[in-house]
UniProtKB/Swiss-Prot annotation:
J-like as annotated region, ranges: 58-110
Organism per entry: Mus musculus
Localisation: Mitochondrion inner membrane
Family: Belongs to the TIM16/PAM16 family.
InterPro entries according to UniProt: J_dom_sf, Tim16
Function recorded in the entry: Regulates ATP-dependent protein translocation into the mitochondrial matrix. Inhibits DNAJC19 stimulation of HSPA9/Mortalin ATPase activity.
Presence of keyword Cell inner membrane: no
Residues that bear Phosphoserine: 69
GO BP annotation list: DNA biosynthetic process; negative regulation of apoptotic signaling pathway; ossification; protein import into mitochondrial matrix
The name this protein goes by in its record: Mitochondrial import inner membrane translocase subunit TIM16
The keyword Chaperone belongs to this UniProt entry's keyword annotation: no
Length: 125
């Protein structure tokens, strides 16, 4: 009886161990595929987010832009910067957020232009 119980326990541990190993391999493969999909631009964009303290989405929300167009970014930046000027009753905190958002979007535009040059395409403007 004890012999059979020991065999059942050993078989159960083997099954669970194999399942765990298979799940671990699948998770590793999925994380590698996701990293490959992000590519090199993802690393640059993440580095830009770390430097400015804002993600790309946050910067777009602050400046109210949906597409990365240098003209639209500049227009919205100038408007929000003037509106939040402390001399007209604005907030220095909000004005600094606007500046950081503009810096972040300018960095993203620079990264895109660099990628376009590397691909031999005309930069988007």
């Amino acid at each position: 009886m004890a012999k059979y119980l020991a065999q059942i326990i050993v078989m159960g541990v083997q099954v669970v161990g194999r399942a765990f190993a298979r799940a671990l391999r699948q998770e590793f493969a999925a994380s590698q595929a996701a990293a490959d999909a992000r590519g090199r631009a993802g690393h640059q964009s993440a580095a830009a987010s770390n430097l400015s303290g804002l993600s790309l989405q946050e910067a777009q929300q602050i400046l109210n832009v949906s597409k990365l167009s240098p003209e639209e970014v500049q227009k919205n930046y100038e408007h929000l910067f003037k509106v939040n000027d402390k001399s007209v009753g604005g907030s220095f905190y909000l004005q600094s957020k606007v500046v950081r958002a503009k810096e972040r979007l300018d960095e993203e535009l620079r990264i895109q232009a660099q990628e376009d040059r590397e691909k031999g395409q005309k930069p988007k403007t």
